[in-house]
Amino acid sequence: MIRIFSLILFVIISNKAIASVKGETLICDKDTRGYNFISKDEVKISGINLNELNTFYINHSYEITENAIFIKQLLTALDKEETSRPIGWIFRRNLDYVSLDYVNDDWSRKFLWSCEATTSEQLNIRIKNKLNELIKVNGKKL
């Protein structure tokens, strides 16, 4: 009886550990995009706008499954739609990210890059360093 109870308790604890990414931070795409999971269903995406050479921060919702983290549409867009389609997903095993793009009335895969775990402080530092590097390179071209 104790073995069965221990097994059930272990399964419950393991399942909760797998199902939570709150507080985790990922940096992707050669330090140009980051994901800070700030709550159980909200992720703050930071990145570099390559056209304007500045940083942006956008809050999205996300859904976690056993194998992937689905990044959903903007939180403000969720108020308008009842069901939210994923705009990308991160594979939990290898931290590869796939982004979807809406082209010609259809969703298609747009990007695929790798992510790595980091801290939110390191995320901000690395994105700012990458932005400064891009500004220097762009300045030399002018």
Protein language model features and the residues they cover:
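Short, solvent-exposed mixed-charge patches
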Residues: 9, 139-142
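Sec/Tat signal peptide C-region and signal peptidase I cleavage site
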Residues: 15-19
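Sec-dependent N-terminal signal peptides
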Residues: 4-13
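Beta-sheet ligand-binding and adhesion/scaffold domains
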Residues: 32, 72-138
